Amino acid sequence: MTNIRKSHPLIKIVNDAFIDLPAPSNISSWWNFGSLLGVCLIVQILTGLFLAMHYTSDTATAFNSVTHICRDVNYGWLLRYLHANGASMFFICLYLHIGRGLYYGSYTYTETWNVGVILLFAVMATAFMGYVLPWGQMSFWGATVITNLLFAIPYIGTELVQWIWGGLSVDKATLT
């Protein structure tokens, strides 16, 4: 008698991918965080797209758009909370993924590690823009702190802040 998980065509695909996966026996749960990063990224993109459908750049109506999403949009409250908490979960998985790389000495593969560092900077820049740009004045503090950090870069700091924000003070909605 054959086992159904090895003979049925559809169940065999799931069996080969999850149960009888040809992977080394020394892989621990630390190796799951790369996959979790992908899941978190997909959730962030999808919820961000749906939230952007109700985006308002006017500072007078920005907070009203948030309440509109939570009250009037079907499962809008869930979209908002998934997007906010998904960002936190994304960065938790990201830092655990980096920690796993440090623990197992992956920094010795310099090309791969440098690509990871570039991706980390790109993720942080994207998260900053996603945090600062929408909904007007909700993130003055974050924009001010990061603007001051950019200003501290030698030689190019002043020009960089002028180019990004137009000056040291952040005012009104930045997406108009």
UniProtKB/Swiss-Prot annotation:
Heme b b566 binds at H97. Keywords: Electron transport, Heme, Iron, Membrane, Metal-binding, Mitochondrion, Mitochondrion inner membrane, Respiratory chain, Transmembrane, Transmembrane helix, Transport, Ubiquinone. It is found in: Mitochondrion inner membrane. Its cofactor is heme b. The chain crosses the membrane at residues 33-53, 77-98, 113-133. Heme b b562 binds at H83. CDD domains: Cytochrome_b_N (cd00284). One of its GO terms (biological process) is mitochondrial electron transport, ubiquinol to cytochrome c. It is a multi-pass membrane protein. Heme 1 (or BL or b562) is low-potential and absorbs at about 562 nm, and heme 2 (or BH or b566) is high-potential and absorbs at about 566 nm. Belongs to the cytochrome b family. The cytochrome bc1 complex contains 11 subunits: 3 respiratory subunits (MT-CYB, CYC1 and UQCRFS1), 2 core proteins (UQCRC1 and UQCRC2) and 6 low-molecular weight proteins (UQCRH/QCR6, UQCRB/QCR7, UQCRQ/QCR8, UQCR10/QCR9, UQCR11/QCR10 and a cleavage product of UQCRFS1). This cytochrome bc1 complex then forms a dimer. This is Cytochrome b. The lineage of its organism: Eukaryota, Metazoa, Chordata, Craniata, Vertebrata.
